[in-house]
């Protein structure tokens, strides 16, 4: 009497998960918000150098999914950029 133990095929999702080490192959860890934390810079409409880091080369506000800014800080950042534009510290469009 031979007890045959069936093993699952290697190409099943469960087998692949254990073979890879239970980690997703293209998983990227979410970056932390650059304005959260102890040494984070304060968002100020007069700090043109800081605000220009969050503008595209065309002068548009870069979305938070690219810059990893939290939703609350993204609203604050957008308000500061718009205020700086109104005061002619930043351009509306770049040629």
UniProtKB/Swiss-Prot annotation:
Entry keyword annotation includes Ribonucleoprotein: yes
Alphabetical keyword list: Ribonucleoprotein, Ribosomal protein, RNA-binding, rRNA-binding
GO CC entries: cytosolic small ribosomal subunit
Range of residues in the leader sequence: none
Pfam families to which the protein is assigned, alphabetical: Ribosomal_S18
One GO process term, biological-process aspect: translation
Residue ranges the record marks as coiled coil: none
InterPro entries associated with the record: Ribosomal_bS18 (IPR001648), Ribosomal_bS18_CS (IPR018275), Ribosomal_bS18_sf (IPR036870)
One MF term in the entry's GO annotations: structural constituent of ribosome
NCBIfam families according to UniProt: S18 (TIGR00165)
Similarity comment: Belongs to the bacterial ribosomal protein bS18 family.
Quaternary structure note: Part of the 30S ribosomal subunit. Forms a tight heterodimer with protein bS6.
Stated role: Binds as a heterodimer with protein bS6 to the central domain of the 16S rRNA, where it helps stabilize the platform of the 30S subunit.
The protein, known as: Small ribosomal subunit protein bS18
Organism: Acidiphilium cryptum (strain JF-5)
Lineage: Bacteria, Pseudomonadati, Pseudomonadota, Alphaproteobacteria, Acetobacterales
